Amino acid sequence: MSDFDAIVVGAGPAGSCAAIVLARAGKRVALIERGPFPGSKNMYGGVIYPRILDELIPEWWLHAPIQRWITRRSTMIMTETQALNVDFRTQAWGHPPYNGATAYRPDFDHWLADVAVEAGTTLICSTTVTGLLHGANGHVSGVTTDRPDGDLTAPIVIACDGVNSFLAKQEGLYGAVDADNYTLGVKETLGLPKHVIDERFGVRGDEGVDI
């Protein structure tokens, strides 16, 4: 008998959501995170798009650690000599159902993983999945880890270990991608007083901006 019905690798939003669905279906689920806690190694920015949360966690906004609600979105298209900016604002986005929110990813990811644990998921942190196990038929049968107690088995492994998934590459599911199809992003978190943020971005209260 396998250790679990399913193993989810990566406790970011995708991994926690997958674990929530499986656990609620009565499956034995392991959610493995290589960081010391969910959100400690997050990569993408702090804007949360709530469509999936609306389906998984009714009235999630009453419990999630949200900083601001997105009421303004701004997109800029630039060339070497020109720039076009499209700016959209609406007060309707500041009320349920929300269009988006800003959050500190360590706080948000921790909260979402806790929802998965409450549903019955086993959360395993500070553990790196180093590879996949295969049964006699060649099918994936679990994962190898850097833990002293070794491997974990399950008939289903869901790789939520990021856009450059090591596990997907190992299984040949992630083909070579031309460098021209990549973009480089830089993320920096700055602390500013609330009144400074409101003044600079033209917002008030718990309104937020996605640029």
Regions found by a protein language model. Give the residues of each.
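Short beta-strand to alpha-helix junction loop
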Residues: G94-D114
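Predominantly flavin-linked oxidoreductase catalytic cores and closely associated redox partners
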Residues: V115-I211
